């Protein structure tokens, strides 16, 4: 019954008849695949736990972790409780073109390490990087040299996010085997330090010098802490949506990253959290495309808001139960009491003929997903649709509930500009001060230090706070440069 196998006359007489689902088949049972992926993630975690316990049996004083690849939709990440802490692997330059500018492919995606930090740090607090790219690699589609300074930039990015350790793969370039063309800290002679190795040396020297400046207590500016934001994440939502996208242009992670990118431009500390965490420690809680939900979770959201939290919920949230089934109720109605809205319907447009959503008399293009809302009297309309048969109908709303607020954004736009503008509008409403850092520049604080990282293709001049003192670099930061200051 949980899988709805009566649909298309599927029936199982016993568990022995159940086979592994063929996920490549377009119409394979969605609910069965969801449960199978839960099972597979659980088995992976059990196996990691078994290995950890076995190692600890014979090496009781040995720390045990594993080297996760940050594929965030894989359900086993963070689920092995026998690990002492979390670690991940991160490569930045391997032939993609996600950097900024003509040579951005030599530096890498500006938020790739930042997002990994913000994802892994909240799991246990203690975490690090087990593999960080030391230079040129062998396994990409095209394997260019990193830009001089990029390896050091990546190391500083790991440190800035709060990591406790950093390792690389590998020390020496291998003389044989599959990865002969993979750089190490030293070259094939085992003696000559590579360009990346020299940047490791520079970083280690800088960290040693910082020990005379750091604060043992994690001092951070008050304005920075006011911006603290959590993104509620459950990989199962991606599993469910990706089986039934309804629009080929839908991308769950791209939807989340539109908001994440804006938050980092605000200079906001961000945590990706699960439902196990306490929502109340965050002034703002973002809930993007959280499709699988139940009444217990919705009640927690309501409680968070009534006690003073600012909740931002986006499209496709709470439309299915935990099995991926549609409730026998009006579509999407589980959160009606939370948002103060009813949903009339949702629409999906061809990318060749996008629609327009308008906020503060400015137009924004969309096509992937749009919910037409019917707001209650207490709701304020933030954005409306244009140029469709539902022109003038609400796309986003805002309401006050108890001591807090609820914002519902029912549309996913094309380039993220709308998402940025609505967050700017909301943080102003919340009286939370934000920065306006250009894409490619990030700011983090740890141990009484401010750390500014420049992944962009041009120099950036950071306004040094009053009373701050530069300890690494200068306020005008070149491409692949770093600036560190004390508070």
Give names to the regions the model predicted.
Residues 14-21, 33, 37-40, 49, ...:
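Carbohydrate-binding surfaces of carbohydrate-active enzymes
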Residues 1-66, 70-82, 266-267:
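Active-site neighborhood of glycoside hydrolase catalytic domains
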Residues 82-86, 162:
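Glycine-enriched alpha-helix->loop->beta-strand junction motifs that scaffold or abut catalytic
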């Amino acid at each position: 019954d949980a899988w709805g196998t009566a649909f298309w006359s599927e029936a199982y007489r016993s568990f022995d008849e159940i086979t592994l689902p063929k996920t490549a088949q377009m119409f394979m049972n969605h609910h069965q695949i969801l449960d199978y992926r839960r099972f597979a993630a659980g088995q992976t975690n059990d196996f990691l736990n078994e290995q950890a316990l076995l190692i600890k049996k014979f090496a009781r004083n040995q720390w045990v972790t594993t080297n996760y690849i940050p594929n965030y939709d894989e359900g086993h990440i963070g689920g092995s409780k026998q690990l002492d802490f979390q670690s991940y692997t991160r490569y930045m330059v391997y032939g993609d073109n996600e950097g900024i500018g003509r040579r951005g492919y030599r530096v890498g995606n500006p938020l790739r390490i930042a997002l990994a930090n913000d994802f892994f740090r909240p799991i246990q607090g203690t975490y690090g990087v087990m593999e960080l790219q030391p230079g040129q690699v062998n396994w990409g589609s095209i394997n260019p040299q990193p830009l001089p300074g990029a390896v050091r930039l990546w190391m500083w990015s790991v440190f800035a996010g709060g990591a406790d350790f950093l390792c690389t793969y590998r020390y020496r370039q291998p003389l044989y085997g599959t990865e002969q063309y993979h750089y190490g800290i030293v070259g094939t002679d085992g003696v000559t330090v590579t360009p990346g190795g020299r940047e490791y040396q520079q970083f280690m020297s800088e960290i040693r010098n910082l020990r005379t400046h750091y604060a043992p207590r994690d001092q951070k500016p008050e304005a920075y802490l006011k911006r603290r934001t959590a993104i509620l994440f459950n990989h199962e939502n991606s599993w469910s949506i990706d089986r039934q996208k309804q629009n080929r242009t839908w991308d769950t992670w791209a939807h989340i990253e539109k908001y994440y990118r804006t938050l980092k431009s605000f200079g906001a500390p961000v945590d990706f959290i699960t439902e196990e965490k306490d929502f109340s420690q965050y002034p703002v809680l973002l809930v993007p495309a959280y499709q699988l939900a139940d009444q217990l979770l919705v009640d927690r959201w309501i409680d968070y808001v009534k006690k003073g939290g600012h909740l931002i919920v986006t499209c496709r949230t709470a439309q299915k139960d935990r099995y991926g089934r549609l409730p026998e109720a009006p579509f999407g109605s589980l959160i009606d009491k939370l948002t103060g809205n009813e949903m009339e319907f949702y629409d999906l447009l061809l990318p060749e003929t996008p629609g327009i959503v308008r906020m503060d008399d400015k137009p924004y293009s969309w096509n992937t997903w749009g919910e037409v809302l019917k707001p209650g009297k207490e709701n304020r309309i933030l954005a409306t649709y244009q140029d469709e048969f539902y022109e003038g109908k609400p796309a986003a709303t805002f309401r006050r509930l108890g001591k807090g607020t609820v914002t519902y954004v029912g549309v996913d736009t094309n380039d993220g500009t709308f998402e940025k503008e609505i967050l700017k509008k909301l943080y102003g409403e919340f009286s939370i001060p934000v920065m306006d850092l250009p894409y490619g520049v990030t700011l983090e604080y740890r141990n009484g230090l401010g750390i500014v990282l420049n992944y962009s293709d041009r120099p950036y001049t950071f306004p040094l706070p009053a009373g701050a003192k530069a300890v690494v670099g200068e306020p005008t930061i070149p491409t692949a440069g770093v600036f560190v200051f004390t508070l």
